[in-house]
Amino acid sequence: MDKVTLKKNLQEKMDKALKVLDHELKGLRTGRASVNLLDSVTVEAYGDRMPLSQVASLTTPDARTINVQVWDKSMVSSVEKAITVANLGLTPSSDGQLIRLPIPALTEERRKELAKLAHKYGEDTKISLRNIRRDGNEELKKMEKDNIIAKDEHHSLAEQVQKLTDEYSSKVDSAIKQKEQEIMTV
């Protein structure tokens, strides 16, 4: 592996770690309605388990409601059951075709729990970034040992790897700070 490939590889891995964090943060319920809350819901449909988004259209008509328009009327009850079983704290109400999910206001205690969880996701992502950095530094040592790069070049590249790690770590911090503000806003 050459140094350009190594840097590109590290950057791709760090981007993936950030995408995972972003996905986890989107799943955290804030005071606002978001169709991302239902990403984890799977429905028993046609003899298989399918994501809710493949059997219904999801919309947010206002900040406190999610509407689930089920395409096949015979599946409305199984969609309601799947939402209830998902344990999201949402109570579906249906008129036979459209399912409405009112989003209850978050209590102060629940907001703090969610902020803590967001912080934990951030820490887990930082651990992933540090592991990626460690792997990169080990690869640099191997490259130096195999005489692919010189010792001074090894130190220069190690500094670049650290700089890259710091850059991504600050992106994690800002994402967590933004999510915590979003959660704590009443």
Curated annotation (Swiss-Prot):
GO biological process: cytoplasmic translational termination
Major subcellular site: cytoplasm
Keyword field contains Protein biosynthesis: yes
Keyword set includes Cell membrane: no
Matching Gene3D superfamilies: 3.30.1360.40, Ribosome-recycling factor (1.10.132.20)
Record InterPro entries: Ribosome_recyc_fac (IPR002661), Ribosome_recyc_fac_dom (IPR023584), RRF_sf (IPR036191)
GO molecular function annotations of the record: ribosomal large subunit binding
UniProt keyword terms in alphabetical order: Cytoplasm, Protein biosynthesis
Subcellular location: Cytoplasm
GO terms for cellular component: cytosol
PANTHER family documented for this protein: MITOCHONDRIAL RIBOSOME RECYCLING FACTOR PSEUDO 1, RIBOSOME RECYCLING FACTOR
Family per record: Belongs to the RRF family.
Described purpose of this protein according to its UniProt entry: Responsible for the release of ribosomes from messenger RNA at the termination of protein biosynthesis. May increase the efficiency of translation by recycling ribosomes from one round of translation to another.
Annotated protein name in UniProt: Ribosome-recycling factor
Provenance organism: Rickettsia bellii (strain OSU 85-389)
